[in-house]
Amino acid sequence: MTSRSQDPPLLEVAVTSADGRSRVTVAGELDAASAGELEAALSEPATAGTVVELDLGQVTFIDSSGLRALLVVQQAVSDGGGSLMLGATTPAVDRLLQLTGLSETFPRVG
C-alpha cells in the first residue's frame, strides 16, 4: 500500500515568462481538490499586466470548480491590466465551456 504523499500530483502547473507574456501549462485534473493550485500559481502573472496564455491541452478532467478557477483567474488578470487567452484545450475543457455557454468568454490564441 502506498501513502498519498507518494502518489503523483493530480495537477501540475508550469509558468514561463518571456517577452511580456506568460505561458501557463496545466496538466492533470482541474477540480475542487486542485483549483486552488491553479489560482495560486497564477497570482503573480495575473498582476503583471501582460498577456497570460493558458495551455489546457493536458487537462484530463475539469469540473465546475475548475471552471470557477478559470473565471477567477481571468478576472484577476483583467484587474491587473492584462488579458487571459486560451491556448491548447482538450475535448473535456471544450465540452464544459460549450455546455456552460462560456466558450466565447475566453479568447483563443491564434
Regions found by a protein language model. Name each.
Residues 1-61, 72-110:
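STAS-like cytosolic regulatory interaction modules
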